[in-house]
């Protein structure tokens, strides 16, 4: 199926997902890429992001260079903590509170440890309002769409002032790690292996080695010509036969 965002053209896939998953049958999910957005596609079993099985547990670094992504050194500058929202209609958001409440929870927890500026950045297609006046040094700054692209935003520009990025499981965390910015994410995020798990260290975030992470990440996404050649399907089919069928 295409995506687990139960909205618009993708809404019809929810019935397929629930029918097969309720029978413990595997579902292959195709989702827009995060490494090369609008160029590549994630293809995994039984979900998206870290909830999916990409058959990439034991891979080398031979594929990463193909993406031509600069992995910048971890930086210890910046001042803003950027809290990124995501689409609440997505299966990824199940069991989570309304987005406004989630934002409040993140702000409250962060403020236990630091008074750094906090920027709330809602998902571009899932607007939300919260009362920032009850907090100190917190503001909402929505993403600006790049009209020259399908759905790119000004994330790269926003990250220039970032000290850290907070995200449940969406792609901005991945972009932040590429840019050398520490992230705070949930276990559902593809950035979890190089992310921070608690705000207790927000003033001195962990900055782990990223080589193994990029190796695994490179086997989550594929170009259309590779899909036409059957390269990802060959890997996924093998995994299905070994583990799910």
Locations of the language-model features?
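Secretory-pathway glycan-assembly enzymes, especially type II membrane glycosyltransferases
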Residues: 1-67
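Short loop/turn segments at strand-loop or loop-helix junctions that form parts
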Residues: 1-7, 31-34, 78-90, 122-124, ...
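Active-site regions of enzymes building and remodeling cell-envelope glycoconjugates
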Residues: 1-3, 24-28, 41-47, 81, ...
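Well-ordered, non-membrane alpha-helical segments in soluble/globular domains
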Residues: 10-15, 97-109
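Leloir-type glycosyltransferase catalytic cores
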Residues: 41-78, 193-245
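Surface-exposed cleft-lining segments at the edges of enzyme active sites
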Residues: 88-99
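Catalytic donor nucleotide-activated moiety binding site of glycosyltransferases and closely related
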Residues: 107-149
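A donor-sugar binding/catalytic signature common to diverse glycosyltransferases
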Residues: 150-197
